[in-house]
């Protein structure tokens, strides 16, 4: 997998940042899609393109990627009890949007 163009959803979060570091070390071109609800701009890595957007709007991205790592999610338990509809919107509807976009554009999802 040499020099692939890779999209990382949730790329400004803890796991996303560490994955992006590894992908860059391997020589890949990386784009991060994150709405910064929990990710931080301070986590940005040089040479990575960052898109500040919700995963539900992924359909507007040009589908010229080789691979997508889907890490965007609301993972904290307590907020899921406080606002289950938001958790469903992000974790279920958002994941479906990513999967549909990847399928239409013939992009592998990890």
Q: Residue spans of the language-model regions?
A:
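N-terminal Rossmann-like NAD(P)+-binding domain of SDR-like oxidoreductases, especially those catalyzing
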Residues: 1-110
């Amino acid at each position: 997998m040499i020099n692939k163009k890779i999209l990382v959803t949730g790329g400004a979060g803890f796991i996303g940042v560490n994955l992006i570091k590894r992908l860059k070390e391997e020589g890949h071109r990386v784009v991060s899609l994150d709405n910064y609800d929990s990710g931080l701009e301070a986590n940005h890595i040089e040479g990575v393109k960052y898109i500040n957007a919700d995963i539900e709007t992924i359909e507007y991205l040009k589908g010229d990627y080789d691979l997508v790592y889907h890490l965007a999610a609301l993972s904290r338990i307590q907020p899921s009890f406080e606002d289950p509809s938001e958790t469903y919107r992000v974790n279920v509807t958002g994941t479906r949007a990513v999967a549909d976009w990847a399928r239409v554009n013939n992009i592998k999802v990890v």
